[in-house]
Amino acid sequence: MREIVTLQFGERSNYLGTHFWNTQESYFTYPPEAESPVNHDILFRPGIAPDGSDTFTPRALIYDLKGAFGSMRKINALYEPEDDRSILDQPGVWPSKPIVQRTQPIPPSTYQEHLDNGLDPPALNISSVRYWSDYSRVFYHPKSIAQLSEFDVNDTLMPFEKWEVGKGLFEKLEREVDLVDRDLRPFVEECDGIQGLQIFTGVDDAWGGWASGWIERLRDEYGKMSIWTWGLGDQGANAAVGRERRLQQMVNASQSLQTLGEQSSVYIPISNSPTKTPSYLSLDATSLWHVGALQAIGLESMTISSRLRTSVGGRGNLQDLEDTINSTGKRRIGKFEMSIADPEVLSENYSKEMAQAEKTGSMTSRRTSEDDEELSSFDIDVFTRDYRAVSRSGKKEHVFGRAEVSRGDWNLTDDNEARDPHNRFNQGPTLQRYTAPILFPLLDSYPTSIFDVGSGLGTKLAVHAGLTTSTAVAGQIRAVEQIVKRLVGIEEREALCNGLQVLAEEYDEGWDSGTDSDDDG
């Protein structure tokens, strides 16, 4: 069945994940509607509620800190509430009953209240979204919700900020309860033929250490299983944060880069504050609701080929995408970019270009993949971070491989014109293009105001996303290494910097063996 199990680590990933799951839920169709082109069995698991009714809940494991879940209950409307008497009334070693102290429950958002009552919800805005659960449209299985009670969200006395804190917490809980066995194995073992795991995680705080502990354990447990990790963070780019914390974020992100870049099948770093943005994007980088929405468009589009039914082009599973960008098996870090457009405007432009091409007797408007210069360009670069460090100025970026996904009439070459990653005699970068027969839906839980495309009244977006391995990845890794070698202690420096150098060198092999790395002085 090619199932995918999703792991979400931390507040940032859950803002993104909520948008992602809302989008998946919107693809469900019911008779007499036509069958959805999306195979829901890949991401959703069937079940039976206590009342005997059928349920369909995400194959997801969601971690967050105490207080970060908002009004979300572990036991929701699909399942009976647990009877507290089963705990309080059973005999124990103490002669008297325990006194249970409960925190004041967080009231649901107005949006959630309307959904619960079957009413059309009001429009959301930055001030009305307090928690990621405030705009969730999906019910989760109780086993999907995992609260880390050791830390409170936004706790200034004991913040969950340092990479080592997250790694240490994972190791502690793994020794005590075997997290993988308790939390993840039930989801994996109910799959008929799992396609892989996808991880959404923060990387520039303690969640990076938590995710690193997880992925090392996953590699021990599941060997060569496909694991895609999407690493989210400011990585020191948020000027509103104090200097000391920004420097700590950069160290955290570098430690995450080393471990996740080495252990993941594909690791995609995503900046919360993209350096390259188009004029049609109005993003409030201080709002995780905004940031998660933009990230969800790209992530959901980039991987949609792995969820489509085979009858509508579902041939690009996670392994196919990996093979395209990572021909050596060692270039695991990908540069992610995308473009967004109004589908009606895009179709009009496409028709005009085709008409003009036919009139002149040529098809010059069609793109080819003969060399790097003729690869598609994108409007939004969520990978590159301007570290203002020594860079390979004057050297042209060399592309090794790229996987692209398009939704809408983007005027690209047909799939069968793309270069086959399995053909070693092809010259130039390997390239695979996948098309999806559905546009990205703009739901009422989505901040539609961040885009100024078309009339502004559309309910869907056209998306073109690309994941690339190129020498630009090595440039970013080396820039990170140059900075963190001045920030970390001698004991950690050698192992961390050597690990980063090894990752960067994979993008030199067969192309350019030179490096910009300096010796420690």
Swiss-Prot record:
One of its GO terms (biological process) is mitochondrion organization. PANTHER family: MITOCHONDRIAL DISTRIBUTION REGULATOR MISATO, PROTEIN MISATO HOMOLOG 1. Gene3D superfamilies: Tubulin/FtsZ, GTPase domain (3.40.50.1440). Transmembrane segments: none annotated. The keyword Mitochondrion applies. Involved in the partitioning of the mitochondrial organelle and mitochondrial DNA (mtDNA) inheritance. Belongs to the misato family. It is found in: Mitochondrion. InterPro entries: Beta-tubulin_BS (IPR013838), DML1/Misato (IPR049942), DML1/Misato_tubulin (IPR029209), Misato_II_tubulin-like (IPR019605), Tubulin/FtsZ_GTPase_sf (IPR036525). Keywords: Mitochondrion. This is Protein DML1. It comes from the Eukaryota. Pfam families: Misat_Tub_SegII, Tubulin_3.
